[in-house]
Each structure stands twice: as structure tokens, then as C-alpha cells.
Amino acid sequence: MAKEIENLWREVRELSLGTKIDRFDSQPSPVKFLRNYVSQSKPCVISKAITHWPALKLWSDPAYLTGALSDDVVSLHLTPNGCADAVTGDSDLCFASAHVEKVLFPEALKVVQSSCKGLKVGYLQQQNDCFRTEYSTVALDCDGDIEWATEAFGCSPEAVNLWIGTDDSVTSFHKDHYENLYAVVSGEKHFLLLPPTDVHRLYIEQYPAANYSYHRDTDAFKLEVEEPVRHVPWSSVDPYPSPEKEASERLKFPLFFDGPKPFHCTVKAGEVLYLPSMWFHHVSQTPGDGGYTIAVNYWYDMQFDIKYAYFNFLQSLLYKSSSLNPVLSWREDEDSESSDAEIAP
């Protein structure tokens, strides 16, 4: 079966995806978007999709945001390394989630801007429709939906989320069960993308769920495994290992490093990425003039149709290859819980 799976990786690129992400200078019609991208599960970037948003000019100024949101309490996510919702690199591997505090926005933004990897990294990434709840004061600076996408999908967004971070924050490989329209307002977002067909290349394993707790008196973090133990299926691959780990990582994960290259795209301020449901994505960022990166994303319900059934069948297959060595099997145990639909860059 290994040969057939490897052929699938190549075939989807030859028949449909190509070698790079399509880009447009103007908004596509709903019909074109639905026919050429949604129906084919194919990402694209629209360069001038949100140039009319007031947020593009206003949000690069920290003084505007802290003034407009001066009395608003928001959810601040804290980690020691900028890797929330990710597999830890420690000897006792687990799926680590951030420590979350409710603080006034001006304080939260100050923590984000002063982030230092290895000590404390702040990220505003609450999800759960946070843009229309925690940040409703500035919601009118953006559109309530992506109009041509709403018409194509036939529904309004289920959730709209706001993300504010620095280059110290990284989102590990994961997938979402949503059609995602990802709009960058300030700075840049850098995406590595893999189609659902490449699921075996990400070495998804079951990891015990854990949570960081942050202690202000000592300015230190503690990682605690949840009780009772709950397992989360997550990718084991870090696509950018440190130089001292690169050789060993390549040996452990040859399907990723020796297979077809992931798609890479940079989404700049004013641009929108269409990220199809169930596509795996890893995200890093470059701050803009305000010293942070800001994005707003729109989650639309995906169709749980035949493509979803095909994906479940594919990921249930054992991958065995004498030449590449790994034996992979992904199964959701009865006590495991997939949270990937709730996590996005």
C-alpha cells in the first residue's frame, strides 16, 4: 500500500494542485471561487480583497487599538516558547496548551509586544468567535463576512476570530474542519500547506493533553498533564528543526522531509488566503509597523461529504515501507479527543 499512497501524493499535484498557490489581484466571482477552488479543495490567495477595510490603516497604530479597546477584557494566551497547542520537545512528550488569563486589552497588547522566546510569549488567539465577542468594539473596522465567499458557501461564517502576535509565536501543523478565509491586516503570515492526501507524512500520534500554568510571583511556567488523562491526535513533525536537531529529525520523519515539498505562501497585509477544510497548515509570522501581526479569519462550515469519507478511509490505512522505514497507524481511541477544529493560525 505504501507505493500507492506515495503515488497519490504525486498524482494530486500533477492533476490538480500544481506546484504553487494561485494568486489573484481582485476578488473572484462566487461561481469561479466555488467551481475552481472550493469544489477542488484548492487554496488560493486574493491580493486586493480587503483594501477597503478601515482596519488596514487604523490597526497598525497601537495607540488606536489600546484607545478603542481600553475597557475591554480579552483572553491572553501565554507560553514559555511561543508554541501553544503543540507537541512539546521535552523527553516526556505531550500536547501542550497555553495558560490563559483574562486581562484588559492594553495590558495584553503590552505583553504580546514584549514577548521573549524562552521566557514568556503572549498571543491573542482565543478563537471561538472572539472577534464578535471580545473585540466587538472594533468589529466595524472589518467586514462581517467575506461577501463572495458567503455567497459561494451559501451560509454566513460560523465564527470570526482575531489573532495578534509576534514572530515568537508559531502554530504547529494541524487541520480544521472549516472552510477558512484568512485575512491579514498588519504584518505577514507564512503558511506551509499540505493537502489531506498527505496525512501519513505528518506522523500523527496520540499525545497526553497538558496545560501550562504561569506563576506571576516567580515569572515561571509549569506544564501539567490533565487528570484524568486525555489524548489528542497531533502531528509529530517540526518542519523547521534547529540545526543541531535537523539530522535526527530527518531520520525520524523521512516521509515529510523526503516527500513532495509542502506548498509555501506568504500572505501580506490586505491579502486573503482561502484555506480549504482539512488542509494541514503550519504558520509563522512577521510583525508589521506596530510591532505585531494581526489577522482576522472567517470559519465557514465544511461539507461532511464524500471527500470527508475518503479522507477518513485514507488515514485509517497502515503505511508500511521497507525503504522509508516508518510504520504509521492513526486511530482515535475512545478516550482521545481531536481538538483540531478549534485551532488555527
Swiss-Prot record:
Disruption phenotype: No visible phenotype under normal growth conditions. Reduced abscisic acid (ABA)-mediated growth arrest during the post-germination stage, with stronger effect in plants lacking both JMJ30 and JMJ32. The double mutant missing JMJ30 and JMJ32 exhibits an early-flowering phenotype at elevated temperatures (e.g. 29 degrees Celsius), associated with increased H3K27me3 levels at the FLC locus and decreased FLC expression. The double mutant jmj30 jmj32 has longer primary roots. In jmj30-2 jmj32-1 double mutants, reduced brassinosteroids (BR) mediated repression of ABA-inducible genes (e.g. Its cofactor is Fe(2+). It comes from the Eukaryota. Expressed ubiquitously including in vasculatures, leaves, siliques, roots and inflorescences. Present in the root meristem. Accumulates in cotyledons and root tips of young seedlings. Its main location: nucleus. Fe cation binds at residues 174, 176, 281. It catalyses: N(6),N(6),N(6)-trimethyl-L-lysyl(27)-[histone H3] + 2-oxoglutarate + O2 = N(6),N(6)-dimethyl-L-lysyl(27)-[histone H3] + formaldehyde + succinate + CO2; N(6),N(6)-dimethyl-L-lysyl(27)-[histone H3] + 2-oxoglutarate + O2 = N(6)-methyl-L-lysyl(27)-[histone H3] + formaldehyde + succinate + CO2; N(6),N(6),N(6)-trimethyl-L-lysyl(27)-[histone H3] + 2 2-oxoglutarate + 2 O2 = N(6)-methyl-L-lysyl(27)-[histone H3] + 2 formaldehyde + 2 succinate + 2 CO2. Gene3D superfamilies: Jelly Rolls. Keywords: Abscisic acid signaling pathway, Brassinosteroid signaling pathway, Cytoplasm, Endoplasmic reticulum, Iron, Metal-binding, Nucleus, Oxidoreductase. One of its GO terms (molecular function) is histone H3K27me2/H3K27me3 demethylase activity. Residues 122-315 form the JmjC domain. Binds 1 Fe(2+) ion per subunit. InterPro entries: Cupin_8 (IPR041667), JmjC_dom (IPR003347), RmlC-like_jellyroll (IPR014710). It is found in: Nucleus; Cytoplasm; Endoplasmic reticulum. GO terms for biological process: negative regulation of gene expression, epigenetic; primary root development; regulation of abscisic acid-activated signaling pathway; regulation of brassinosteroid mediated signaling pathway; regulation of photoperiodism, flowering; regulation of seedling development; response to abscisic acid; response to temperature stimulus. Its EC number is 1.14.11.68. GO terms for cellular component: cytoplasm; endoplasmic reticulum; nucleus. Belongs to the JARID1 histone demethylase family. Histone demethylase that demethylates 'Lys-27' (H3K27me) of histone H3 with a specific activity for H3K27me3 and H3K27me2, and involved in the regulation of gene expression. No activity on H3K27me1. Together with JMJ30, regulates the flowering-repressor FLOWERING LOCUS C (FLC) locus by removing the repressive histone modification H3 lysine 27 trimethylation (H3K27me3), especially at elevated temperatures (e.g. 29 degrees Celsius), thus preventing extreme precocious flowering. This is Lysine-specific demethylase JMJ32. The gene is JMJ32.
